[in-house]
A protein has these predicted regions:
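Positively charged n-region of N-terminal signal peptides that target proteins for export
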Residues: 1-4
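Carbohydrate-active catalytic/glycan-binding domains of CAZyme proteins
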Residues: 23-304
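Composition-driven detection of intrinsically disordered, low-complexity segments
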Residues: 7-8, 36
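Short amphipathic alpha-helical "recognition" segments used for binding
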Residues: 6-7, 304
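Bacterial N-terminal signal peptides
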Residues: 8-16
Length: 304
């Protein structure tokens, strides 16, 4: 009996470790889910003339440092199949000035990026050719050094299967780097790293799956994860259509970055507005949807 009691206690302990925490009832504050569109949209677009950035696409990424806003974006044109990195700045996060008429990182495919500042270094996680995620680093936001494709391993340490792994989204939590990535937009996986060199899956199944509701039944990909009021919120884009002809912006919440609860009123932004990211703004947030053109939304309490 004593041995059975020990075994039973061990099983309960394992279940407790693996079970998600019970989330409070009001887990989706209004300022994270209720947004009003800025009347001057779009606030940033491709040039629409014959330049390397005639059009923009996928997720760009915005950081605010002091009074200034910085955006990195993906530009492309019919003249080249390669997607290039651009950079622009703003005093108000609405009116933008391109840093250069040329790409700031010529010769390499950089698309769908996430930028994290740690110490004095900027880390960019982006898709390269074939939707393979890679990392670049910078000290000044403009000059970037390539660090190679991300090395992602299964739980057992073996490499993940060959093929695309894109839309890399990274957050630091408790001294650990957490990487969310998708595979053909068919689910969102989570891997962690202590050294930014080798990433290991937390589990080999997606932490966010498609469905069961219609709005994200055919595609999901994480765009940004923030820590707010003790919980983690993930903004992700999704499609309700098998041919992906329309996308939406959605949100989910987690206490541990592994177990996620989707917002029952998703999507929070429809009308084919996707690749959404947020910035704290006064008492609320700004939400930028980045794909094809940048549109801005303000949550209740955000300064205008």
């Amino acid at each position: 009996m004593k041995k059975l009691g020990i075994i039973y206690g061990f099983i309960l302990g394992v279940l407790a470790i693996n079970a998600p925490e019970v989330l409070p009832q009001n887990t989706f504050p209004s300022e994270l889910v209720n947004f009003k569109e800025y009347p001057g949209n779009p606030i940033f677009t491709g040039t629409n003339v014959d330049t390397w950035d005639k059009q923009i696409r996928e997720r760009g990424f915005i950081l605010k440092e002091g009074p200034n806003y910085h955006v990195w974006f993906t530009g492309y044109s019919p003249a080249s199949p390669t997607k290039f990195l651009g950079y622009a700045t703003s005093k108000d996060g609405i009116h933008w000035e391109r840093f250069s008429k040329e790409t700031i990182h010529p010769g390499q495919w950089v698309e769908d990026m996430c930028v994290v500042k740690s110490g004095k270094t900027y880390y960019m996680f982006a898709e390269g050719e074939g939707d393979i995620a890679h990392m670049l680093v910078s000290k000044d936001r403009v000059h970037w050094q390539e660090k190679g494709n991300l090395d992602i391993r299964k739980v057992d340490g073996s490499p993940i299967r060959k093929g695309a792994y894109g839309t890399p989204t990274v957050i630091q939590a408790k001294g650990i780097w957490h990487l969310f990535y998708e595979r053909d937009d068919l689910g969102i996986w989570l891997a962690t790293s202590k050294d930014l060199k080798t990433w290991t899956n937390v589990q080999d199944e997606p932490v966010i799956k498609m469905g069961p509701d219609a709005y994200d039944l055919f595609a999901v990909a994480m765009n940004q994860v923030i820590h707010y009021k003790g919980l983690y919120y993930g903004y992700y884009h999704a499609s309700a259509f098998k041919d992906w002809h329309e996308w939406s912006t959605n949100i989910a919440v987690s206490s541990d970055l592994i177990h996620w609860k989707k917002y029952e009123r998703n999507p929070i932004i429809g009308n084919n507005q996707s690749s959404g990211i947020v910035l704290k703004d006064g008492k609320g947030f700004r939400l930028y949807t980045m794909h094809r053109k940048v549109n801005l939304y303000f949550s209740e309490g955000a300064s205008k």
